[in-house]
Amino acid sequence: PWLFRQRHGRPLVTAKIATTIDGRIAAPDGTSQWITGPDARAHAHEIRSRIDAIVVGTGTALRDNPKLTARRPDGQPYAHQPTRVVTGRRDLPADAALREGPGYLHVHSHDPAAVLAVLRDALWVLVEGGPSIIGAFADADLIDEIDHYLAPALLGAGASSVGAQRVTTLTDKRVFRRDVVTELGDDLYVRYRRQLGDGAGFRAR
């Protein structure tokens, strides 16, 4: 991440999604806990323990009331905790889990570039969703990696992992290359990195 920031003048951005085989992150009634199993969730928390900041939109913050902390499988916190960032104009209630403890930021903007400007001293930023904010970062060409946790299940309907993007034809697609594939219990973890020469993209780490 340090070399990436030196070259591009901004943090490395990883988008994290957890979906069923048919690309859903929640059932039609909105339930989403849990799409993936305990091994995948433990893996995601270990990654959280190494990043500088974790970003969600106000929709996710208000709907799920997440803590966004990095916790070991036994529930104990990791020594390093990421800065918890919520983006959007709606305020969170005073008792929101995100507000507990130090390291909380609210960026009152939907602009991904504005979020990264606030986080300019960070090396590695994780965008955890929901679909609107991930779609916004994709549209802004500001996703360098995707951490995809794939659960062996079908929902058929429900929320998609990435919101609407300004892509109208196949040639507009944003291309990533598969970098890591790991089995995590019944789930599959795949890290994709932006294909070299495609946008800002990933260069080094």
Predicted features by range, described:
Residues 3-5, 9-205:
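Enzymes that bind and transform nitrogen-containing heteroaromatic metabolites
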